[in-house]
Amino acid sequence: LTQSCFDGIRRSKFENILVMDGDLQHDPKYIKKMFKIYKKFNLDIVIGSRKLLSGKNQGLSELRRFTSIMLIYFFRIFKIKTNDPMSGFFIFKKEIYNKNKKFFFGKGFKILADFLINSKQNLKTRDITIDFYRRYNSESKMSLRVLFILIQFYLLSLVKKIFN
C-alpha cells in the first residue's frame, strides 16, 4: 500500500496531498475542515485522528485498538506529536515526500508513521478528531505480530535518526 501511495505522490502535479484509506472507515466530510486548518496554520501534516484513547470508536476491534494505543504511547516516548500515528487519513505537503523520500521505509501500510518517524525535518502537525466507522468488507492488517514488527522497525529508524 505504501508503494502505491508513493507512486501517486510522485505522479501528482499538486503541492498538497490527501491520503485516505479506501475501506470506507473515514468520512470525507472532514476533508474541507482538515484542509482549512492545514492552510490557516501553515502545517506540514493534518491528521484525521480516531478517538483511540477515549474508547469511543466503533471501527476498531479490541486487538486493533490495543495495538494502535501501544503505538501512540511508543510515539510519545520519542516526542512525535499525534494521537493517531497509524491514521490512514491525512493531508500533507508534497515537499515532505520530495525532501525525505530516500529516508522512508516505503513498505507495508502505515505511510503516516513512516513520514513521522523518518522525515529529517521537524514537522508541524495537528490532529483533527474524526468519527471512524466499522469496516464492512475487509479485515485489518494490524495484529500483535505486525505491532512488534512496526516497533522493531521504528526503533531502528529512530536509532539511525539519532546517530546520523
Where are these regions (language model features)?
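Terminal low-complexity segments of carbohydrate-biosynthetic enzymes
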Residues: I96, Q152-N164
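Catalytic donor-sugar/metal-binding loop of nucleotide-sugar-dependent glycosyltransferases
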Residues: K81, L116-Y133
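Acidic metal-phosphate-binding loop of nucleotide-sugar-dependent transferases
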Residues: L24-H26
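DNA-recognition element of transcription regulators
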Residues: A113
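Acceptor/aglycone-binding surface of glycosyltransferases and processive sugar-polymer synthases
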Residues: L1-R11, N16, P28-F109, R135-Q152
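Short glycine-centered, acidic/aromatic-flanked micro-motifs in structured strand/loop junctions
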Residues: G22, R50, I130-F132
